[in-house]
Amino acid sequence: MRTGKLTATVTAGVTAALTALAVAGCSGGGTPQRGESGRSPSAAPTPTWDPVQGPPRTVPAVQKFSAADGRGWRPGKQARVVVPAGEKSPVADEAERFARELGGLRTVWGKQTVRPGDVELKLSDDGAGRADNAPVYDTADEAYTVTARGTRLTLTAPTDAGIFNATRTVLQSVRASGGVPEGTIEDRPDRAQRGFMLDIARKHFDARWIEDRIRDLAGLKLNQLQLHFSDDQAFRIESEKHPEIVSADHLTKDQVRHLVEVARGLHVTVIPEIDSPGHLGAVLKAHPDLQLRSADGRTERGAMDISQPGAAEIVDDLLREFAPLFPGKHWHLGGDEYRALADRAPAENYPQLARAAREKYGDGATIEDLATGWLNDRDKTVRAAGAQHVEAWNDGYFPDTDVEPDPHRTVAYWTGKEIGAREPAEYLRENRKVVNLNDEYLYYVLGEPNNMPYPTGERIYKQWTPGVLRGTQPVPESSSGPDRVLGARFAVWCDLAGEQTQQQVADGIRMPLRALAQKVWDRREPALSWEDFKKLANQV
Protein backbone atom coordinates (compact mmCIF):
# COMPACT_ATOMS: atom_id res chain seq x y z
CA MET A 1 0.00 0.00 0.00
CA ARG A 2 1.33 3.42 -0.95
CA THR A 3 0.12 6.34 1.13
CA GLY A 4 -0.21 9.46 -0.95
CA LYS A 5 0.14 11.81 1.97
CA LEU A 6 3.43 11.37 3.74
CA THR A 7 4.16 12.07 7.35
CA ALA A 8 5.73 15.50 7.32
CA THR A 9 7.83 18.03 5.48
CA VAL A 10 11.53 18.26 6.23
CA THR A 11 12.15 19.03 9.88
CA ALA A 12 14.42 21.79 11.08
CA GLY A 13 16.94 19.23 12.30
CA VAL A 14 17.17 17.48 8.92
CA THR A 15 17.44 20.80 7.10
CA ALA A 16 20.28 21.86 9.38
CA ALA A 17 22.12 18.60 8.75
CA LEU A 18 21.79 18.98 4.98
CA THR A 19 22.96 22.59 5.14
CA ALA A 20 26.04 21.59 7.11
CA LEU A 21 26.90 18.92 4.56
CA ALA A 22 26.48 21.34 1.68
CA VAL A 23 28.99 23.69 3.31
CA ALA A 24 31.39 20.75 3.68
CA GLY A 25 31.10 20.09 -0.04
CA CYS A 26 29.30 16.74 0.16
CA SER A 27 25.79 17.55 -0.96
CA GLY A 28 25.79 17.82 -4.71
CA GLY A 29 22.99 19.42 -6.69
CA GLY A 30 20.10 18.60 -8.94
CA THR A 31 16.45 17.82 -8.37
CA PRO A 32 15.73 14.66 -6.32
CA GLN A 33 14.23 11.87 -8.46
CA ARG A 34 11.53 9.43 -7.42
CA GLY A 35 13.66 6.39 -8.16
CA GLU A 36 15.76 4.41 -10.58
CA SER A 37 16.37 0.77 -11.29
CA GLY A 38 19.15 -1.21 -12.91
CA ARG A 39 21.57 1.70 -13.32
CA SER A 40 25.24 1.54 -12.54
CA PRO A 41 25.94 3.96 -9.72
CA SER A 42 28.18 6.89 -10.50
CA ALA A 43 31.09 7.52 -8.21
CA ALA A 44 30.25 9.41 -5.05
CA PRO A 45 32.79 11.28 -2.94
CA THR A 46 33.50 9.85 0.48
CA PRO A 47 31.87 12.22 2.98
CA THR A 48 34.18 14.16 5.25
CA TRP A 49 31.74 15.26 7.92
CA ASP A 50 32.57 15.51 11.60
CA PRO A 51 31.90 12.28 13.52
CA VAL A 52 28.38 11.95 14.90
CA GLN A 53 28.50 11.77 18.67
CA GLY A 54 26.75 8.82 20.32
CA PRO A 55 24.85 7.12 21.76
CA PRO A 56 21.67 7.71 19.70
CA ARG A 57 19.29 10.21 21.29
CA THR A 58 15.69 9.15 20.72
CA VAL A 59 12.23 8.92 22.33
CA PRO A 60 11.82 6.15 23.25
CA ALA A 61 15.45 5.24 23.93
CA VAL A 62 16.90 2.35 21.96
CA GLN A 63 17.43 -0.92 23.77
CA LYS A 64 21.04 -1.54 22.70
CA PHE A 65 23.76 0.43 20.94
CA SER A 66 27.20 -1.02 20.21
CA ALA A 67 29.55 1.83 19.37
CA ALA A 68 32.34 1.54 16.80
CA ASP A 69 35.12 3.77 15.49
CA GLY A 70 34.10 5.93 12.56
CA ARG A 71 32.30 9.03 11.38
CA GLY A 72 28.78 7.64 11.57
CA TRP A 73 26.18 8.68 9.02
CA ARG A 74 24.63 12.04 8.19
CA PRO A 75 21.98 12.80 5.53
CA GLY A 76 23.36 14.44 2.38
CA LYS A 77 21.60 15.60 -0.76
CA GLN A 78 23.62 13.23 -2.93
CA ALA A 79 22.63 10.27 -0.76
CA ARG A 80 20.13 7.69 -1.96
CA VAL A 81 17.68 5.37 -0.27
CA VAL A 82 18.40 1.92 -1.70
CA VAL A 83 15.87 -0.95 -1.72
CA PRO A 84 17.57 -4.14 -2.99
CA ALA A 85 14.27 -6.05 -3.09
CA GLY A 86 12.88 -3.65 -5.66
CA GLU A 87 9.91 -1.37 -6.18
CA LYS A 88 7.34 -4.03 -5.31
CA SER A 89 8.94 -4.81 -1.95
CA PRO A 90 6.81 -4.37 1.20
CA VAL A 91 9.31 -1.70 2.28
CA ALA A 92 8.94 0.38 -0.90
CA ASP A 93 6.44 2.76 0.71
CA GLU A 94 8.68 3.05 3.77
CA ALA A 95 11.61 3.95 1.51
CA GLU A 96 9.71 6.63 -0.39
CA ARG A 97 8.36 8.20 2.80
CA PHE A 98 11.77 8.12 4.43
CA ALA A 99 13.46 9.65 1.38
CA ARG A 100 11.07 12.57 1.45
CA GLU A 101 11.41 13.04 5.19
CA LEU A 102 15.17 13.26 4.70
CA GLY A 103 14.75 16.19 2.32
CA GLY A 104 13.78 14.63 -0.99
CA LEU A 105 16.47 12.00 -1.49
CA ARG A 106 16.42 9.70 -4.51
CA THR A 107 15.04 6.17 -4.03
CA VAL A 108 16.66 3.43 -6.08
CA TRP A 109 15.44 -0.11 -6.60
CA GLY A 110 17.24 -3.42 -7.03
CA LYS A 111 20.60 -4.87 -6.04
CA GLN A 112 23.50 -2.50 -6.60
CA THR A 113 26.55 -1.04 -4.94
CA VAL A 114 25.67 1.00 -1.87
CA ARG A 115 27.64 4.24 -2.13
CA PRO A 116 29.08 6.37 0.66
CA GLY A 117 26.26 8.34 2.27
CA ASP A 118 23.51 5.95 1.08
CA VAL A 119 20.82 4.32 3.21
CA GLU A 120 19.89 0.70 2.50
CA LEU A 121 16.52 -0.74 3.60
CA LYS A 122 16.08 -4.49 3.57
CA LEU A 123 14.00 -7.24 5.13
CA SER A 124 15.77 -10.10 6.85
CA ASP A 125 15.25 -13.61 5.48
CA ASP A 126 12.35 -14.38 7.83
CA GLY A 127 10.46 -11.39 6.40
CA ALA A 128 10.33 -12.81 2.89
CA GLY A 129 6.87 -13.28 1.46
CA ARG A 130 5.05 -11.03 3.92
CA ALA A 131 2.35 -8.74 2.56
CA ASP A 132 2.77 -4.98 2.76
CA ASN A 133 1.56 -3.57 6.10
CA ALA A 134 0.65 -7.05 7.35
CA PRO A 135 -0.38 -7.19 11.02
CA VAL A 136 2.36 -7.79 13.56
CA TYR A 137 1.85 -10.53 16.13
CA ASP A 138 4.54 -9.96 18.72
CA THR A 139 7.39 -7.64 19.58
CA ALA A 140 9.83 -9.64 17.46
CA ASP A 141 7.88 -8.48 14.40
CA GLU A 142 8.68 -4.87 15.32
CA ALA A 143 12.38 -5.41 15.99
CA TYR A 144 15.03 -3.80 13.81
CA THR A 145 18.74 -3.19 13.42
CA VAL A 146 20.41 0.03 12.26
CA THR A 147 24.09 -0.16 11.33
CA ALA A 148 26.19 2.92 10.57
CA ARG A 149 29.47 1.78 9.01
CA GLY A 150 31.84 3.44 6.58
CA THR A 151 29.52 6.46 6.08
CA ARG A 152 26.74 4.12 4.97
CA LEU A 153 23.55 3.26 6.84
CA THR A 154 21.75 -0.10 6.76
CA LEU A 155 18.26 -0.66 8.18
CA THR A 156 17.25 -4.32 8.59
CA ALA A 157 14.07 -5.86 10.06
CA PRO A 158 11.86 -8.94 9.68
CA THR A 159 8.84 -6.80 8.73
CA ASP A 160 8.01 -3.45 7.19
CA ALA A 161 6.75 -2.42 10.65
CA GLY A 162 10.27 -2.98 11.94
CA ILE A 163 11.72 -0.98 9.06
CA PHE A 164 9.27 1.82 9.86
CA ASN A 165 10.44 1.83 13.48
CA ALA A 166 14.03 1.98 12.28
CA THR A 167 13.27 5.03 10.14
CA ARG A 168 11.71 6.78 13.15
CA THR A 169 14.88 6.15 15.13
CA VAL A 170 17.06 7.55 12.35
CA LEU A 171 14.92 10.67 11.92
CA GLN A 172 14.99 11.39 15.64
CA SER A 173 18.74 10.84 15.81
CA VAL A 174 19.21 13.25 12.90
CA ARG A 175 17.10 15.89 14.64
CA ALA A 176 18.93 15.49 17.93
CA SER A 177 22.51 14.86 16.76
CA GLY A 178 22.65 15.57 13.04
CA GLY A 179 22.98 11.90 12.14
CA VAL A 180 23.53 8.38 13.44
CA PRO A 181 26.74 7.52 15.34
CA GLU A 182 29.05 4.78 14.07
CA GLY A 183 27.95 1.39 15.37
CA THR A 184 24.91 -0.85 15.56
CA ILE A 185 21.48 -0.26 17.11
CA GLU A 186 19.52 -3.39 18.06
CA ASP A 187 16.05 -2.49 19.18
CA ARG A 188 12.60 -3.91 19.84
CA PRO A 189 9.67 -2.93 22.09
CA ASP A 190 9.12 -4.41 25.52
CA ARG A 191 5.30 -4.41 25.13
CA ALA A 192 3.34 -5.33 22.03
CA GLN A 193 0.41 -2.96 22.64
CA ARG A 194 1.34 0.71 22.99
CA GLY A 195 -1.26 3.33 22.41
CA PHE A 196 -3.81 6.04 22.95
CA MET A 197 -7.55 5.93 23.67
CA LEU A 198 -9.74 8.84 22.55
CA ASP A 199 -13.31 9.53 23.65
CA ILE A 200 -14.92 11.08 20.57
CA ALA A 201 -18.43 10.34 21.86
CA ARG A 202 -18.60 13.01 24.56
CA LYS A 203 -16.63 15.54 22.50
CA HIS A 204 -16.46 15.80 18.73
CA PHE A 205 -12.91 15.88 17.40
CA ASP A 206 -12.50 16.71 13.74
CA ALA A 207 -10.89 14.21 11.39
CA ARG A 208 -7.79 16.33 10.76
CA TRP A 209 -7.09 16.57 14.50
CA ILE A 210 -7.38 12.79 14.87
CA GLU A 211 -5.09 12.29 11.87
CA ASP A 212 -2.50 14.56 13.48
CA ARG A 213 -2.65 12.40 16.61
CA ILE A 214 -2.12 9.24 14.54
CA ARG A 215 1.00 10.75 13.00
CA ASP A 216 2.26 11.79 16.42
CA LEU A 217 1.67 8.28 17.80
CA ALA A 218 3.54 6.71 14.90
CA GLY A 219 6.52 9.00 15.41
CA LEU A 220 6.77 7.74 18.99
CA LYS A 221 6.47 4.08 17.92
CA LEU A 222 3.04 3.87 19.57
CA ASN A 223 0.95 1.44 17.56
CA GLN A 224 -2.70 1.66 18.68
CA LEU A 225 -5.53 4.19 18.62
CA GLN A 226 -8.72 3.15 20.42
CA LEU A 227 -11.79 5.15 19.35
CA HIS A 228 -14.65 5.26 21.87
CA PHE A 229 -17.34 6.61 19.53
CA SER A 230 -20.62 5.71 21.25
CA ASP A 231 -21.81 6.82 24.68
CA ASP A 232 -24.70 8.48 26.49
CA GLN A 233 -23.96 11.87 24.94
CA ALA A 234 -23.54 11.00 21.27
CA PHE A 235 -22.92 8.45 18.54
CA ARG A 236 -20.17 9.91 16.37
CA ILE A 237 -19.81 7.82 13.20
CA GLU A 238 -22.23 7.71 10.30
CA SER A 239 -24.52 4.65 10.31
CA GLU A 240 -26.53 3.49 7.32
CA LYS A 241 -28.36 0.79 9.27
CA HIS A 242 -29.36 3.07 12.13
CA PRO A 243 -29.14 6.71 11.01
CA GLU A 244 -31.58 7.65 13.77
CA ILE A 245 -28.89 7.26 16.43
CA VAL A 246 -26.19 9.39 14.78
CA SER A 247 -25.39 12.79 16.30
CA ALA A 248 -25.28 16.00 14.27
CA ASP A 249 -21.52 16.35 14.71
CA HIS A 250 -20.01 13.10 13.53
CA LEU A 251 -17.39 11.53 11.30
CA THR A 252 -18.49 10.18 7.96
CA LYS A 253 -17.53 6.64 7.04
CA ASP A 254 -15.27 8.02 4.31
CA GLN A 255 -13.45 10.10 6.90
CA VAL A 256 -13.02 7.04 9.10
CA ARG A 257 -11.78 4.97 6.15
CA HIS A 258 -9.18 7.64 5.47
CA LEU A 259 -8.07 7.67 9.11
CA VAL A 260 -7.83 3.88 9.21
CA GLU A 261 -5.82 3.86 5.98
CA VAL A 262 -3.45 6.58 7.20
CA ALA A 263 -3.01 4.64 10.44
CA ARG A 264 -2.40 1.38 8.60
CA GLY A 265 0.30 2.98 6.47
CA LEU A 266 1.98 4.20 9.66
CA HIS A 267 1.61 0.82 11.41
CA VAL A 268 -1.01 2.04 13.86
CA THR A 269 -4.05 -0.17 14.50
CA VAL A 270 -7.38 1.59 15.06
CA ILE A 271 -9.45 -0.22 17.71
CA PRO A 272 -13.19 0.54 17.66
CA GLU A 273 -15.27 0.54 20.83
CA ILE A 274 -19.05 0.35 20.98
CA ASP A 275 -19.69 0.12 24.72
CA SER A 276 -22.56 -2.06 25.95
CA PRO A 277 -24.77 -2.88 27.80
CA GLY A 278 -24.18 0.49 29.50
CA HIS A 279 -23.15 3.83 28.01
CA LEU A 280 -25.74 3.52 25.23
CA GLY A 281 -27.65 6.74 25.85
CA ALA A 282 -27.41 7.98 22.26
CA VAL A 283 -28.85 4.69 20.96
CA LEU A 284 -31.56 4.61 23.62
CA LYS A 285 -32.65 8.16 22.88
CA ALA A 286 -33.87 6.85 19.53
CA HIS A 287 -35.05 3.52 21.02
CA PRO A 288 -36.54 4.35 24.43
CA ASP A 289 -38.40 1.03 24.55
CA LEU A 290 -35.04 -0.68 25.16
CA GLN A 291 -34.17 1.53 28.15
CA LEU A 292 -33.59 -0.28 31.44
CA ARG A 293 -36.26 0.53 34.02
CA SER A 294 -36.32 -0.39 37.67
CA ALA A 295 -39.27 -2.04 39.41
CA ASP A 296 -40.54 1.37 40.50
CA GLY A 297 -40.35 2.76 36.95
CA ARG A 298 -37.09 4.67 37.26
CA THR A 299 -35.06 4.83 34.05
CA GLU A 300 -31.32 4.30 34.14
CA ARG A 301 -29.41 6.60 31.80
CA GLY A 302 -27.43 4.76 29.18
CA ALA A 303 -28.35 1.29 30.44
CA MET A 304 -30.00 -1.13 28.02
CA ASP A 305 -32.56 -3.67 29.17
CA ILE A 306 -30.72 -6.81 28.10
CA SER A 307 -33.69 -9.00 28.97
CA GLN A 308 -35.30 -7.77 25.73
CA PRO A 309 -34.42 -9.53 22.44
CA GLY A 310 -34.37 -6.18 20.66
CA ALA A 311 -31.39 -5.08 22.73
CA ALA A 312 -29.06 -7.71 21.28
CA GLU A 313 -30.48 -7.18 17.80
CA ILE A 314 -29.61 -3.49 17.57
CA VAL A 315 -26.16 -3.80 19.17
CA ASP A 316 -25.25 -6.73 16.91
CA ASP A 317 -26.53 -4.72 13.93
CA LEU A 318 -24.05 -1.98 14.81
CA LEU A 319 -21.16 -4.35 15.48
CA ARG A 320 -21.67 -6.05 12.12
CA GLU A 321 -22.05 -2.75 10.31
CA PHE A 322 -18.84 -1.26 11.64
CA ALA A 323 -16.64 -4.37 11.50
CA PRO A 324 -15.67 -3.82 7.83
CA LEU A 325 -14.77 -0.21 8.61
CA PHE A 326 -12.11 -1.32 11.09
CA PRO A 327 -10.19 -4.23 9.52
CA GLY A 328 -7.41 -4.23 12.12
CA LYS A 329 -8.69 -7.40 13.90
CA HIS A 330 -9.14 -5.66 17.29
CA TRP A 331 -12.47 -4.86 19.02
CA HIS A 332 -13.32 -3.35 22.38
CA LEU A 333 -16.75 -4.33 23.74
CA GLY A 334 -16.90 -1.93 26.71
CA GLY A 335 -18.90 -3.73 29.38
CA ASP A 336 -18.24 -1.21 32.16
CA GLU A 337 -20.52 0.62 34.58
CA TYR A 338 -23.76 -1.23 33.84
CA ARG A 339 -26.14 0.63 36.15
CA ALA A 340 -28.09 -2.44 37.25
CA LEU A 341 -24.94 -3.92 38.76
CA ALA A 342 -24.03 -0.71 40.56
CA ASP A 343 -27.23 -1.22 42.58
CA ARG A 344 -27.06 -2.70 46.08
CA ALA A 345 -30.05 -4.96 45.38
CA PRO A 346 -30.06 -5.62 41.62
CA ALA A 347 -32.34 -8.67 41.62
CA GLU A 348 -34.96 -6.85 43.68
CA ASN A 349 -34.84 -3.61 41.73
CA TYR A 350 -34.51 -5.15 38.25
CA PRO A 351 -36.61 -8.32 38.44
CA GLN A 352 -36.85 -8.64 34.65
CA LEU A 353 -33.06 -9.07 34.47
CA ALA A 354 -33.03 -11.63 37.28
CA ARG A 355 -35.83 -13.55 35.56
CA ALA A 356 -34.04 -13.48 32.19
CA ALA A 357 -30.86 -14.80 33.84
CA ARG A 358 -32.70 -17.77 35.35
CA GLU A 359 -34.52 -18.53 32.11
CA LYS A 360 -31.32 -18.51 30.08
CA TYR A 361 -28.80 -20.01 32.49
CA GLY A 362 -30.73 -21.91 35.16
CA ASP A 363 -32.29 -21.37 38.57
CA GLY A 364 -29.13 -20.24 40.34
CA ALA A 365 -28.12 -17.70 37.70
CA THR A 366 -27.70 -14.03 38.57
CA ILE A 367 -27.73 -10.71 36.74
CA GLU A 368 -23.93 -10.95 36.69
CA ASP A 369 -24.34 -14.18 34.71
CA LEU A 370 -26.71 -12.43 32.33
CA ALA A 371 -24.25 -9.55 31.82
CA THR A 372 -21.37 -11.98 31.31
CA GLY A 373 -23.41 -13.89 28.76
CA TRP A 374 -24.25 -10.62 27.03
CA LEU A 375 -20.56 -9.82 26.50
CA ASN A 376 -19.84 -13.40 25.41
CA ASP A 377 -22.55 -13.12 22.76
CA ARG A 378 -21.20 -9.78 21.51
CA ASP A 379 -17.74 -11.35 21.50
CA LYS A 380 -19.04 -14.08 19.18
CA THR A 381 -20.58 -11.45 16.92
CA VAL A 382 -17.36 -9.52 16.36
CA ARG A 383 -15.25 -12.67 16.02
CA ALA A 384 -17.64 -13.94 13.36
CA ALA A 385 -17.09 -10.61 11.60
CA GLY A 386 -13.31 -11.06 11.63
CA ALA A 387 -12.05 -9.78 14.99
CA GLN A 388 -9.23 -11.80 16.54
CA HIS A 389 -8.36 -9.69 19.59
CA VAL A 390 -11.35 -8.76 21.74
CA GLU A 391 -11.29 -6.90 25.03
CA ALA A 392 -13.58 -5.37 27.65
CA TRP A 393 -13.17 -3.09 30.66
CA ASN A 394 -12.23 -4.82 33.92
CA ASP A 395 -15.55 -4.03 35.64
CA GLY A 396 -17.27 -6.08 32.95
CA TYR A 397 -15.82 -9.25 34.53
CA PHE A 398 -17.50 -10.58 37.66
CA PRO A 399 -16.25 -13.07 40.27
CA ASP A 400 -17.92 -16.40 40.99
CA THR A 401 -20.34 -16.46 38.06
CA ASP A 402 -21.74 -19.66 36.63
CA VAL A 403 -21.26 -18.20 33.16
CA GLU A 404 -17.54 -17.88 32.44
CA PRO A 405 -16.26 -14.91 30.42
CA ASP A 406 -14.72 -15.96 27.13
CA PRO A 407 -11.21 -17.08 28.13
CA HIS A 408 -9.62 -15.35 25.13
CA ARG A 409 -11.00 -11.90 25.94
CA THR A 410 -8.42 -9.39 27.18
CA VAL A 411 -9.00 -7.31 30.32
CA ALA A 412 -8.61 -3.55 29.83
CA TYR A 413 -7.85 -2.64 33.44
CA TRP A 414 -8.76 0.94 34.28
CA THR A 415 -9.88 1.20 37.90
CA GLY A 416 -10.29 -0.38 41.30
CA LYS A 417 -12.80 2.24 42.42
CA GLU A 418 -16.01 0.81 40.98
CA ILE A 419 -18.45 -1.27 43.03
CA GLY A 420 -17.25 -4.86 43.01
CA ALA A 421 -13.93 -3.98 41.37
CA ARG A 422 -11.37 -6.75 41.59
CA GLU A 423 -7.63 -6.61 42.08
CA PRO A 424 -5.67 -6.95 38.83
CA ALA A 425 -3.80 -9.93 40.29
CA GLU A 426 -7.07 -11.89 40.19
CA TYR A 427 -7.27 -11.64 36.40
CA LEU A 428 -3.62 -12.57 36.07
CA ARG A 429 -4.15 -15.63 38.28
CA GLU A 430 -6.93 -16.62 35.87
CA ASN A 431 -4.31 -16.50 33.10
CA ARG A 432 -6.01 -13.59 31.40
CA LYS A 433 -4.12 -11.11 29.28
CA VAL A 434 -4.33 -7.53 30.55
CA VAL A 435 -3.85 -4.09 28.99
CA ASN A 436 -3.02 -1.24 31.37
CA LEU A 437 -5.22 1.90 31.38
CA ASN A 438 -4.70 2.72 35.07
CA ASP A 439 -6.83 5.79 35.85
CA GLU A 440 -4.33 6.88 38.49
CA TYR A 441 -1.73 7.72 35.81
CA LEU A 442 -3.22 7.26 32.35
CA TYR A 443 -6.63 9.01 32.48
CA TYR A 444 -6.83 12.56 31.13
CA VAL A 445 -10.42 13.53 32.00
CA LEU A 446 -11.56 16.93 30.74
CA GLY A 447 -12.55 19.23 33.58
CA GLU A 448 -10.84 17.02 36.19
CA PRO A 449 -14.10 15.72 37.76
CA ASN A 450 -14.25 13.29 40.70
CA ASN A 451 -10.83 14.33 42.03
CA MET A 452 -9.05 13.25 38.84
CA PRO A 453 -6.30 15.81 38.17
CA TYR A 454 -4.71 15.85 34.75
CA PRO A 455 -1.87 13.32 34.61
CA THR A 456 1.63 14.55 33.93
CA GLY A 457 4.41 13.09 31.86
CA GLU A 458 6.77 13.50 34.79
CA ARG A 459 4.67 11.32 37.06
CA ILE A 460 4.34 8.61 34.42
CA TYR A 461 8.06 8.77 33.69
CA LYS A 462 9.14 8.60 37.33
CA GLN A 463 6.51 6.37 38.99
CA TRP A 464 4.53 4.27 36.53
CA THR A 465 5.40 0.98 34.83
CA PRO A 466 3.20 -1.43 32.85
CA GLY A 467 2.94 -3.52 36.03
CA VAL A 468 1.30 -0.65 37.95
CA LEU A 469 -2.25 -1.58 36.98
CA ARG A 470 -4.23 -0.23 39.93
CA GLY A 471 -3.37 2.71 42.14
CA THR A 472 0.36 3.19 42.62
CA GLN A 473 1.56 -0.32 43.50
CA PRO A 474 2.77 -2.83 40.90
CA VAL A 475 1.55 -6.38 40.69
CA PRO A 476 4.28 -9.00 41.29
CA GLU A 477 6.95 -8.93 38.62
CA SER A 478 6.48 -12.64 38.04
CA SER A 479 2.97 -12.02 36.68
CA SER A 480 3.47 -8.69 34.89
CA GLY A 481 5.77 -9.68 32.03
CA PRO A 482 5.03 -8.78 28.39
CA ASP A 483 3.23 -12.10 27.88
CA ARG A 484 0.71 -11.21 30.63
CA VAL A 485 0.45 -7.40 30.67
CA LEU A 486 0.42 -6.82 26.94
CA GLY A 487 0.93 -3.08 27.10
CA ALA A 488 -0.81 0.17 27.93
CA ARG A 489 -2.82 3.06 26.52
CA PHE A 490 -3.09 6.67 27.60
CA ALA A 491 -6.77 7.68 27.63
CA VAL A 492 -8.54 10.99 27.00
CA TRP A 493 -12.08 11.10 28.40
CA CYS A 494 -14.29 14.11 27.72
CA ASP A 495 -16.65 14.14 30.71
CA LEU A 496 -16.76 17.95 30.70
CA ALA A 497 -16.29 18.40 26.98
CA GLY A 498 -16.20 22.19 26.91
CA GLU A 499 -13.40 22.51 29.45
CA GLN A 500 -10.66 22.24 26.84
CA THR A 501 -10.32 22.98 23.14
CA GLN A 502 -8.83 20.45 20.74
CA GLN A 503 -5.55 22.38 20.83
CA GLN A 504 -5.50 22.39 24.62
CA VAL A 505 -6.03 18.63 24.63
CA ALA A 506 -3.18 18.16 22.13
CA ASP A 507 -0.89 20.31 24.25
CA GLY A 508 -1.93 18.62 27.49
CA ILE A 509 -1.29 15.06 26.32
CA ARG A 510 1.98 15.74 24.50
CA MET A 511 4.44 14.91 27.28
CA PRO A 512 2.33 12.15 28.89
CA LEU A 513 2.33 10.33 25.54
CA ARG A 514 6.10 10.66 25.29
CA ALA A 515 6.59 9.36 28.81
CA LEU A 516 4.26 6.45 28.06
CA ALA A 517 6.16 5.69 24.85
CA GLN A 518 9.39 5.43 26.83
CA LYS A 519 7.98 3.19 29.55
CA VAL A 520 6.23 0.67 27.26
CA TRP A 521 9.20 0.40 24.89
CA ASP A 522 12.01 -0.01 27.41
CA ARG A 523 11.50 -1.73 30.78
CA ARG A 524 14.76 -0.40 32.22
CA GLU A 525 14.91 2.57 34.55
CA PRO A 526 15.19 5.62 32.25
CA ALA A 527 18.77 6.80 31.83
CA LEU A 528 17.83 10.47 31.51
CA SER A 529 16.52 12.75 34.22
CA TRP A 530 13.02 14.10 33.61
CA GLU A 531 14.42 17.53 32.68
CA ASP A 532 16.83 16.01 30.16
CA PHE A 533 14.06 13.79 28.78
CA LYS A 534 11.85 16.85 28.26
CA LYS A 535 14.62 18.68 26.41
CA LEU A 536 15.21 15.67 24.17
CA ALA A 537 11.47 15.26 23.50
CA ASN A 538 11.35 18.87 22.34
CA GLN A 539 14.26 18.26 19.96
CA VAL A 540 13.05 15.10 18.30
Where do the model's predicted regions map?
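Feature activates predominantly on carbohydrate-active enzymes
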Residues: 139-312, 320-330, 346, 496
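Conserved, mostly hydrophobic/aromatic
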Residues: 81, 159, 196, 217, ...
